[in-house]
Amino acid sequence: MLQAHAKVWHTYDNQWRSKQKGMVGISLNGDWGEPVDFTSQKDIEAAERYIQFYLGWFATPIFNGDYPQVMKDYIGRKSAQQGLGTSRLPTFSSQEKSYIKGTCDFLGIGHFTTRYITQKNFPASHGPSYFTDRDLAELVDPRWPDPGSEWLYSVPWGFRRLLNFVKTQYGNPMIYVTENGVSEKMTCTELCDDWRMQYFKEYINEMLKAIKDGVNVKGYTAWSLLDKFEWDEGYSERFGLYYVDFRNKNKPRYPKASVQYYKRIISSNGFPNQKEAENWHRKAIETCSSSNQLLAADPLTSHMEMVTEIVVPTVCTLCILLSAIFLMFLLRRHN
């Protein structure tokens, strides 16, 4: 993937950049890892490994030309303990390092949550695994809000720390936040998504703090516009600003309260003041009630569509068949 990305960057750089003045970047997911115990050097190092094995796996080669040293050390040692002659982590030639390094005009960041990290040794006998290679354990604070997805906890302060990490680690590149949002479970049909508005408010506020820290953030995009297919979770999780009724063949969309709230944040380029933000929240909740009524009526609409599209044609077909049978019966009697 890294070499393919570099190929695209160099192709654009050589053939089109001078005319189009465009940019080529890459979007990477990265969650923040916080040490469980700040007095423990092992926990501090484990938290660093968590980030390097996550974001650094791809970002470090692009900015520095090679995999993070901690990845090379840990995976190399685990590979040797498992009887392998070489590390399971691929190596780059000098030419490849040079070719990959610097192929990023901007960095896209997808961020959703944070974990507490502590040191945990995994014997080589556990077998090769990305998770056991890291020698760490992920923990969560039970007090963190958990809106829907079992992996996604709302931890806004981790966002600011991750953005500052990118600034320090990679020379303060231009950043576009390409994914940030929160989900609810498929069974939820509530359009007044107060928890999503709170998530956006707190996470965007932490991003603004990072900008004041000097992080070169240029843009922000919520994840996502519509409820849709979510990787391993399929349609069982909803991240959308718009509710999609997957039961209906027409897949109608209904705006959640967060639509108006997010719209006001973006059009104002942030939060004018606390009172105004609270007013946005109140208006968004007020406007979602009518949408909820539409959504509540939708099962009836779907039922009527089913009657029109399935039941009526079936009854007509049966009537035609019965008429044909009756006609055949009359003809036989006549003969």
Describe the function of each predicted region.
Residues 318-334:
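Single-pass type I membrane-protein transmembrane alpha-helix
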Residues 302, 315-318:
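N-terminal compositionally biased, intrinsically disordered segments and leader/signal-like regions
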Residues 306-312, 330:
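N-terminal Sec-pathway targeting helices
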